[in-house]
Amino acid sequence: MDSNTVSSFQDILMRMSKMQFGSSSEDLNGMITQFESLKFYRDSLGEAVMRMGDLHSLQIRNGKWREQLSQKFEEIRWLIEEVRHRLKITENSFEQITFMQALQLLLEVEQEIRTFSFQLI
């Protein structure tokens, strides 16, 4: 993963952790957890692509990697919808900027994971 993406993830996670949404703070914590999970998944998929010969061991280790990939895309779609919803309802400019950047990052990561997965197929 390039350093800009790493710092973007870290920056967004830090800013999201500072937000308070009252009764929906559990939802925000869930989003943060999914962001972190997505970052780790993207990193591991990228490393597998960089080793290219790792496809065979990836398939042996986890015969359900396509199912996991599908699940990650569902998580990304859910996060995108959740971020869009938060963006629509918030009036705080700090939160708007954070969610706009989170949305952009999610779209970039979705594309990167698609690229990695096509290289692994």
From Swiss-Prot:
Pfam families: Flu_NS2 (PF00601). It comes from the Viruses. Signal peptide: none annotated. It is found in: Virion; Host nucleus. Mediates the nuclear export of encapsidated genomic RNAs (ribonucleoproteins, RNPs). Acts as an adapter between viral RNPs complexes and the nuclear export machinery of the cell. Possesses no intrinsic RNA-binding activity, but includes a C-terminal M1-binding domain. This domain is believed to allow recognition of RNPs bound to the protein M1. Average number present in a viral particle is estimated to be 130-200 molecules. This is Nuclear export protein. The gene is NS.
